[in-house]
Amino acid sequence: VCNLSAQPDQTASYLHIPVVDLDQDIARQVIVDREDGQYLGHPTTVLLEDGVTILAVYPKGHGRGAIVYRKSIDGGKNWSARIPVPSSWAASQEVPTIHRVIDPLGIKRLIVFSGRYPAKLAHSEDDGATWSELEPVGDWGGIVVMASLIPLNNGKSHYMAMFHDDMRYLTVDGQQAYDEDRKTNNNALFTLFKTLSVDGGLT
């Protein structure tokens, strides 16, 4: 989703993005989670190789908040209760993302990222039955880190992940850099970053 600031008469000739509105199609909607007075949203999911098992993670809050973890074994028609997770997941500061990766030895792994500074990573080697604690990936951070992760076409189980930041979370003093930049620039500069893994997502 993007925000286009051009005038309607300048964009009408080429911006014809089809819209599919399922708001009233209740038969196709599934309530995965609900809690009175609590914002729940921003889920990311991964479909396992059986084609029906879906794992979902999302924050208990708007962006930041404890990571909630749930599972469906029927393609998303029904969902488990909230599944217990390691204690460090309660301190997540950004929307978590979940991905399937396979290392050069053929070991299948699931990884969950949590953003802001420093970016953190947890992993599972039993299809999400158990997880490690969230641990820093490096001396950097970002907003919704690793929203996109793709395998590189080199046959070596290498991956590229991408994220963006507006100065605030890339470094330990990012907020200070951001505040200084606002004194001379009206709008924040968002920068796209990439990071590579050659060990099946562990680093």
Summary of predicted features, one role per range:
Residues 7-203:
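Asp-box/BNR beta-propeller blade signature and adjacent active/binding-site loops
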Residues 1-5:
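C-terminal segment of classical bacterial N-terminal signal peptides
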